[in-house]
Every structure is written in C-alpha cells, then in structure tokens.
Amino acid sequence: MKYLLDSNAWIGHLRQTSPAVTQRLSQHPPTDVVLCSVVLGELLFGVERSAAPKRVTNRALVAALQQQYLSLPFDDVAAEHYGRIRAHLTTAGTMIGSNDLFIAAIAVANGCTLVTHNTGEFSRVPALTLEDWQLP
C-alpha cells in the first residue's frame, strides 16, 4: 500500500510536533510513502514564508524529503479524477479547498491512502481512502 502524506502530516513530522506521525512513518519503507507536487508546493511556500535564519534549515528539510520520497505529479490521469471529483462535490454542494482537490485527485489516481489530519474535508471525496496518523 502507498501512503500519500498531506502537508499537515509532513509539517508535524518535520517540526517534530507529531510524534505519532513520525512513529508511523518509521514503520514503512520509503518506497511505500510518497509526496505529491501540490504538497511539495505547499511545503516550499512555507519555506519561502519562513524568517531568513529558519529558511535555510526548512529548505534543507524539504530537500531531504525530495531525495528520500517519490513525488507524484498532477498528470492526465489525475486530471480525469479531478474533473469527476470536482463535479461530484459541486453537485453535492460540499466543495473542498482547491489544493485539497488536487491532492485528492492525485491520491485516487495513484491508488494511495491519503494521510491527513484534515479528515473532515477530505472525507467528502468519494473513493478516497484516508488515515489520520496524528491520532494515537
């Protein structure tokens, strides 16, 4: 099984504020855990918003993730899922944030379980398997 970690899971791990996430991450080989281009963009946005002394450290942490874990792109298959998911959520009147929609589409397209603490929002997406590693 592949696990796609959402930004909040990676941030908790990198900041060492979510020991449960770090523990669960250590239980899986790096080949079972992935990033995606949208999450990477969110992490890099956080790096750019960091104060100058912290920015170098944060950039190094994100670079280490990029070296250790595969990053899945938003490709044509994900675009197909995006269209279906967005149409479903729009019709149901239960839209989610635009970045979350892209992340969900990438997870579904690649058969990944999405690891997030934001289960309330992501649970609206049909066919998306979720796990919250921040829970004990």
Regions found by a protein language model. Give the residues of each.
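Alpha-helix capping/helix-boundary segments
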Residues: 9-10, 39, 78, 102, ...
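Active-site neighborhoods of divalent-metal-dependent phosphate/nucleic-acid chemistry enzymes
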Residues: 45-48, 68-115
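Short, well-structured N-terminal submotif of metal-dependent ribonuclease cores
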Residues: 1-36, 47-64, 91, 136
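Generic structural signal for small/hydrophobic residues in well-ordered secondary structure
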Residues: 6-7, 21, 43, 82, ...
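Residues at the C-termini of beta-strands that transition into short coil/loop
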Residues: 37-39, 75, 134
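Residue-level recognition of specific faces of alpha-helices
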Residues: 24, 37, 61, 81, ...
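Acidic, PIN/NYN-like endoribonuclease modules and their adjacent C-terminal/linker elements
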Residues: 1, 104, 108-136
